[in-house]
């Protein structure tokens, strides 16, 4: 029998041990998870809530993952650059958190098929790209009910960002509630063409209040509209996070988004190799949307609002159940039918009762 020299045997054993250790270390490498944010993490609104979701994810999954984020990323070419750099830096899972990141995310996803991507509020998927949305329109409908009960001028204001389906359907949800609970109440809209610009947001809120609005909604990310409402002595409804502390004498409720559970579920599925592209919608039932109702709201009104929330959670009520007509009187959703997710995701019309026009 041929005998190998002791030194050669020891070298072979050491090499085997080294290879084993290398494989073990590789198998234990944490999953790299990246987040791309439209605004600053301190905006107290949309980006702030996504950052809270990232923190919840990091706390839950601990050493299994590492997380990082880039804030203040403009939609368009800048977003594409940041997303691509994350993919090049070997991030395994990338969340892109603004509607205008949709096409840049899709483009980069096609170039990096081994990276998993999830895009918030969009509607384009691919094998390695999923989408996720909050049914904020459910919260808007409840907010519309509160506005219907609390307004004295029958004029409600909306500080709007961009005329995209998400914003349009949220405005429509408020108008549908106003039509039902205080017919003849109108929504006045001011577009600021920005997600985060406290100066413009405050100016828009003040312009609405100057027109007689006594309940201010917003689809922007800073608390500036809330603060303007507080100063002017009118009511407001916060957005994305609970904004009550910015206007304790103004805020009736806030449409709060809790992204943590989805971030945890999606990341765990990547770790488990069970992730599949999907179009996820989370609402009141799932806890993705929450509505802390202020004590400014009378007890009887609060009780009725809580029943509306319960009905939405149970499926007994869907804000977009027909018959629903557009502002020109054309039927969009027939009696007994409910808008599909695809119809909600592409909504490009105002419902009956709206007097404003959608910018072209």
Label each region the model flagged:
Residues 23-27:
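Sec/Tat signal peptide C-region and signal peptidase I cleavage site
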Residues 16-17:
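Repetitive helical segments and hydrophobic/amphipathic motifs
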Residues 28-360:
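A residue-level marker of the well-folded mature domains of exported/periplasmic proteins
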Residues 2-12, 21:
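Bacterial N-terminal signal peptides that target proteins for export
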